[in-house]
Amino acid sequence: MNNDVFPNKFKAALAAKQVQIGCWSALSNPISTEVLGLAGFDWLVLDGEHAPNDISTFIPQLMALKGSASAPVVRVPTNEPVIIKRLLDIGFYNFLIPFVETKEKAELAVASTRYPPEGIRGVSVSHRANMFGTVADYFAQSNKNITILVQIESQQGVDNVDAIAATEGVDGIFVGPSDLAAALGHLGNASHPDVQKAIQHIFNRASAHGKPSGILAPVEADARRYLEWGATFVAVGSDLGVFRSATQKLADTFKK
């Protein structure tokens, strides 16, 4: 039986520097995720860091996206091999790794997603990702089809951006604007010139190493500016933000 995720089209699109417009999924619900999957986004982040997600909530959401053209990307809660292994086994192939501050942390993220001898991923012969043992040549195919996107969101990460971007197996550099703003002394103000300068610097250094860059930008003007600066995978909103904004607007229409 063939697995329809091989080859990984999202990974190929990033390598080809094709613009990929995405959305954040934070509601942790298969119905809302399914709706997002019908909207036409190129990729969707299922958030395991700041949203109330775990293995039991991720699986129904992956099922809900089975027929969608939107590539599911999981943001892991932390850069830890056992957590990453479990998310691989349930069927994720695209990973967003938070707080990568050094080349060594980038290398750990890559190694955690590869089977030996290329990495340290633990081996199970039957799990959801290999359709319970029915995918031919799964081990080799998996190693070639994992996407690793690393988040730079601290001063140390900015300082080490060249080493991180040059790491073999890293497919893209993603900026975490809120944490980066906090790290630079501008908590709650990602629009501060210092933060914007750092973001543009990260984009430029990623490009210098032939790596695409991305960011979360729910404000349209910000998203368009980042695209002009060379970002190629940009999340332009979140299900939670759209839901809150739309329901507030609807209530205000009749209550004010």
Swiss-Prot record:
Reaction(s) catalysed (UniProt annotation): 5-dehydro-4-deoxy-D-glucarate = 2-hydroxy-3-oxopropanoate + pyruvate; 2-dehydro-3-deoxy-D-glucarate = 2-hydroxy-3-oxopropanoate + pyruvate
Protein residues bound to substrate: 151, 178-179
Transmembrane as UniProt keyword: no
Site (Increases basicity of active site His): 89
Gene Ontology biological-process annotations: D-glucarate catabolic process; galactarate catabolic process
GO MF terms held by the record: 2-dehydro-3-deoxyglucarate aldolase activity; magnesium ion binding
Keywords: Lyase, Magnesium, Metal-binding
Cofactor(s) the protein requires to work: Mg(2+)
Binding of Mg(2+), residues: 153, 179
Site (Transition state stabilizer): 75
Leading EC class: lyase
Key word Metal-binding present: yes
Cofactor binding, per record: Binds 1 Mg(2+) ion per subunit.
Pfam families in the record: HpcH_HpaI
Active site, renumbered: 50
Pathway noted in the entry: Carbohydrate acid metabolism; galactarate degradation; D-glycerate from galactarate: step 2/3
Gene Ontology CC entries for this record: cytoplasm
EC number: 4.1.2.20
Recorded family membership: Belongs to the HpcH/HpaI aldolase family. KDGluc aldolase subfamily.
Function, as annotated: Catalyzes the reversible retro-aldol cleavage of both 5-keto-4-deoxy-D-glucarate and 2-keto-3-deoxy-D-glucarate to pyruvate and tartronic semialdehyde.
Assembly and interaction partners: Homohexamer; trimer of dimers.
Name of the molecule in the record: 5-keto-4-deoxy-D-glucarate aldolase
Source organism: Escherichia coli (strain ATCC 8739 / DSM 1576 / NBRC 3972 / NCIMB 8545 / WDCM 00012 / Crooks)
The organism's taxonomic lineage, starting at the top: Bacteria, Pseudomonadati, Pseudomonadota, Gammaproteobacteria, Enterobacterales
